[in-house]
Amino acid sequence: MSSKEVKTALKSARDAIRNKEYKEALKHCKTVLKQEKNNYNAWVFIGVAAAELEQPDQAQGAYKKAAELEPEQLLAWQGLASLYEKCNQVNAKDDLPGVYQKLLDLYESADRQKWCDVCKKLVALYHQEKKHLEVARTWHRLIKTRQEDGADRQELYELWRKLSQLLAENIEDQNNETQQMLLTAFENALDLADNIPSEDHQVLYRNFIQCLSKFPHETTKLKKACEEMIAIYPTVQYPLEVICLYLIDSGSLTSEGHQYCCKLVEMNSKSGPGLIGLGIIALQDKKYEDAVRHLTEGLKESPVCIAGWCHLAEAQVKMHRPKEAILSCNQALKTIDNFGASGGNLHQKNLCLRLKAEALLKLSDGASSEEAVRTLDQVSDVDNTPGLLVLQGLACLNTGAVDKATKIMEDLVTSYPDLAEAHALEGRVHFTKKDYVQAEVSFQRALEKDAEVAEYHYQLGLTYWFMGEETRKDKTKALTHFLKAARLDAHMGKVFCYLGHYYRDVAGDRNRARGCYRKAFELDDNDAESGAAAVDLSLELEDTETALAILTAVTQKASAGAAKWAWLRRGLYHLKAGQHSQAVADLQAALRADPKDCNCWESLGEAYLSRGGYTTALKSFMKASELNPDSTYSVFKVAAIQQILGRYSEAIAQYQLIIKMKEDYVPALKGLGECHLLLGKVALVDFLDGKAVDYVEQALGYFTRALQHRADVSCLWKLVGDACTCLHPVSPSKVHVHVLGALLGQKEGQEVLKKEELLSLGGRCYGRALKLMSTSNTWCDLGINYYRQVQHLAETGSSMSDLTELLEKSLHCLKKAVRLDSNNHLHWNALGVVACYRGVGNYALAQHCFIKSIQAEQINAAAWTNLGVLYLATENIEQAHEAFKMAQSLDPSYLLCWIGQALIAERVGSYDTMDLFRHTTELSMHTEGAIGYAYWVCTTLQDKSNRETELYQYNILEMNAIPAAQGVLCKYVERIQNSASAFTMLGYLNEHLQLKKEAAEAYQRATTLLHSAEDQNTYNVAVRNWGRLLCSIGDYDRAIQAFKSTPLVELEDIIGFALALFMKGLYKESGSAYERALAVCKSEQDKAHILTAMAIVEYKQGKMDAAKSFLFKCSILKEPTAESLQALCALGLAMRDATLSKAALNELLKHIKRRNDYHSCLLMSAIYALQGHSVAVQRQVAKAVHSNPADPALWSLLSRIVAQYTQRSAKGGAVAGNVAHILDLNHGKKALLYTAVNQLAMGSSTAEDKSNTALKTIQKAAFLSPDDPAVWAGLMAACHADDKLALLNNTQPKRVDLYLALRSAVAASLKDKEILQNYNQSLEKWSFSQVVTGLIDTGKTSEAESLCTQSLKSNPDQPAVILLLRQVQCMSLLESQKPLPDAVLEELQKTVMSNSTSVPAWQWLAQVYQSQGMMGAAEMCYRKSLQVASQQGNWSGKLSSLLKLALLALEVCMANVSGDHWSSLVQEATSEALKVCFSPLAVFLQALLQFNRKMGARETRRLLERIVYQTGYPSSIVSAARWYLLRHLYAKDDPELIDVLVRNAETHGDKRILELNRKLSAQ
């Protein structure tokens, strides 16, 4: 290609680029390059086209190639620069500065404007990359070029200003050359500025000063710049702030600096630098308050001023505010750490650390001193600075390191003998060692070196304060130095504290002392000692306002748990002022500060007590007592509060603790006496008179001991009088009180006082109290005492003349009490009561007194009641009713007004009488209310005709009247023991409650009281009642004697006598007595009863015909009684004459309304049982239950019948027993036993139900009926069954050692039970067999054998015991697995034959034969047991025999013995068992037979799956069936069914099957 063609191609390429046909341009360029490889323009065009086509690498290569070819040509470099500017690649940015430099070189001579543009681009690039030096140099070159080009002043100003802006960032990272160029830029810009002053110029100056402030070496320029700016802009704060901060940091605040600060503060009162500067100047002038104020305010505005914090800390240390100083130092150190450690900062840091250590040492506590040591360790070059070594020594002293402090002190004194601080430290060391003489010398040396240090004077004064005896007496030296210290340092609070001590304790000037203490506290509000002393002295000087002001000021700013002294004192102040709630709050705050201050707890207790918070006060005093067990006061207050709260026993225990510490502590003795007296009064209210007497006796003992120490205390004598008088209601026979001789005027010993003597002693003690202090209350108590003496003498039969003098004395005393205090309603009331007494009978005076009492106290139920009694006594019924009604309205719970209303109702014959008396007994116990209620209950009970009335239902049944009346009457006779009618009523009520022994005792007491009475008929009735009850409780001899003591003419006496003879076993005499009664008897019904009784007497003598004859006579009477027909029916049963029994029962059913009642049902069932109809027995009772479902007796009977006759319905029997127990507890006691027996009869199915086991049921029965031998026997059976079940479940039996204990319980329960001897003997035999069986099962054969042998020794003729003995003896032989000799087998056979009616005996013999391999003999024995069970109707025996027979045959089958006999026997026995009842075991045995015949047969699987998957089978049988089914399935190789079976086993937790599955699957 020719050169012309090349030019044409290049032209085409240029045109293509212009037309944006870049690819076309590339083609042309490539064409050119094929001809001329080094064509510059072609390479440039390729670069342009590639760049436009976004192919930067190709473009870069092309431009570089072009630049290489012609480096002095611009096009390639311009293209490369443009490419790099657009490209974001890292290497492009790295290469761009070089490209710009090349362009600068090319443009410098060619185009100055473009040179400037490239230069600015290059600077921007350098600035972006933070190449500050290159920025400075390049921009400086630009300025120089523009200067050469003749740029104007404004342009140059802008260029220098721009340079200052470019370099002002990141000054800290710049080198010295760059920084100098920056300053030059600012200076030139300022010089070239035209608009002065102006906003831009001000900003520029501000930036210049800000820049200078960052250059520590340019302080001169900084100061100059600030001064210049201040001159130009006098109202601008910034330069002033900068120069102030500079002067502050440099520590060169002169008068000039002071002017700057003042000017700054004038311009802005909140200027931080200005205030800090003023604070530092104030500190230099020792104006510490101003310094702290200015510095604190300044640092709020300028918190990063390290020098400010340091100076603030220094000022605070000078003002003895160590805690504040520590905070300031910490803030300074934090700021230093944030700004980094330069040389200046290091100095400031050391200064801060020193100040912090000094402040910490002023706190004086160990923790602060330890921190001071750690702080000093951070100071550099501490070992070479004496001042720091002194601080280190003081820190060691405060932490207890005296030896180390001594070493530091000695080194300092040696190295710096002229250093005052060293000698002061020496003095401190000696002072700590209590070597005050040497301390004095050292402090004097320190003062010689520097006499103007307040601390040295204070320490010397302190040394004199604690020095020897002379100085202690004369503290003038101490005072002198304290005063000098106070003069030198007016902020040293502790010196003013000791000045306060001096003026208070030595000079006795309390006003001046208070002033010193207040000054000390003002200086240091943490000085609790000074504050407390100031408050205490203010209170002593009666300046409560000042004291309260101090306390309030402290408590308001105190944090939680602080200022205990202030809270405590303010609390005590409020307590004294009666402001109890505020006192409580303050004392609680004090306790938050010190929870272990027992005094504080005591004060809080007093505060609670003052506002009536007894419980909280009690807790407070108890806490105080815990903290200080030796504090008598705390324990006493605990006891006193418990006494107030009515916790007398606890109070007594506390008082006893005090008496152990101080035997003669009279308040505790008095408290003990009061508590026992109060307990006695409580016992009197509860009618526990014996207890009351004992408590009063103890109270008198304590009061006497107190009087031995303080006989001059009136209240003690009054309390003795109260104790003697309070027993007035107690029966004289119970009052025998031991009184110490000291109370009776004797020197030693004690006497027993009766009631009369005790009341008289009470009167004398009241008199003694009146001699010491005459009060209206004591006069009233004395008057009441005389009145009680009169009452007692009247009860004992004294004549009225003997009582007159005492009554006059009583009236005189009560009138005296009224005169002394006419507004006391109790005095008027007491006077009215005495005026009513029959020996006085002054009703007008009594009425006047009661009215005066009401006037004195409007709410006065007692006075209204007494007024009502007065009206009732005078037959004014309506007025009495109104008075009682008024009393009721005032106090509905006041008992006596209700008794008054009840008496009125009784008098007028109201139906509400009984209800009112009942209400009185519900309110409280009172003799009148009790006897009234008991009388009306007995009266209602005696009326047999009202049983169906609503009145009877409500008053007797619903209100539970009988036990309620019996309860109150018991209390009545406890106190009033001479009322025969009360004892008779009590006996009658006890009879109704089946409390026969108690009834007999009550009747006996009535008989004794009536023995000498004139009314012989009443006496005979009492004896009759007594005899009847003696007979009921089995005391027949005394019953016979009682009835013999009567004339025996009344029918009731004769039949009672006859019954007693009968029960004693004297049947002939009893029969004669009944004949005598029959002769006297007039009523047909009574005759029938007597004939029935005579028939029973004949029956007892074995005269059946005579008995039948008497009963037939009864039946032919006009009105035969149900009892006689029942007796005839029972006689038929006893004679086993079903026809007679049935005829009698049919006749009986004609005469009774309810055919299905318990007795008729029992008789009918007995007849069916006699006829052998077991199912009919159950049906009869079930029918009766259906007719009377609410009768618990019938449900109980049904449960018993099922257990005895139809065990197959045991589940129903258990349910019936539970129903009986729910309906009625009395029947339910026995029903629980029947329930348990039925549960046992149900077998293991109930045992698997953990919530309903026979064992739990029988345990409940034993708890409710511990005297029933059958219950203990049942418990033995339940334990045995539980142990068997445990073995079945492969667990350890729990009750293996209970059998002998339970047999002992059975034997103990059978003692003295003469009724049903045959039943008892059978029970005892069964229990014996059960014990032996249990011992055999648990492996205790030797004990079982010993038990059997002992039983046979006492009675050899016991076939059952012999059988048990042979079973025990055979155990060891069978365990040896040796064949038994024929002789042994023959002996065993004989033993079983002697027990041929025993099913278990034949089964046991069969098991013996089976163990010997004698299967035929075993089969014969099982068949024999089956025969015996069938003959006896023994359902369970029959079932067990069949199952055991089937098991025997199956064992033979599984031994693969040939023949069909045994397999057919299995089938036959199990089929018969299933006919008896559904038996899971029988079904399982059939399945096993099939498994043995054809293991893999489908029938085998069907039978086993029925057991495994159907419900109703016990878990043990199901588990065994799973075992065989799994073997069957593996034999059939059926994995699907195997998985189903394994899942079933997992669900039921059958581990045995899972283990078998693992073994079979591994084979």
Curated annotation (Swiss-Prot):
Its main location: cytoplasm. The keyword Nucleus applies. It comes from the Eukaryota. GO terms for biological process: nuclear-transcribed mRNA catabolic process, 3'-5' exonucleolytic nonsense-mediated decay; rescue of stalled ribosome. TPR repeats lie at residues 6-39, 40-73, 157-196, 272-305, 307-339, 386-419, 420-453, 455-492, 493-527, 564-597, 598-631, 632-665, 633-665, 673-713, 790-824, 826-860, 861-894, 980-1013, 1020-1053, 1055-1084, 1325-1358, 1399-1432. It is found in: Cytoplasm; Nucleus. Signal peptide: none annotated. Coiled coil: none annotated. Belongs to the SKI3 family. Component of the SKI complex which consists of SKIC2, SKIC3 and SKIC8. Interacts with PAF1. This is Superkiller complex protein 3. It comes from Mus musculus (Mouse).
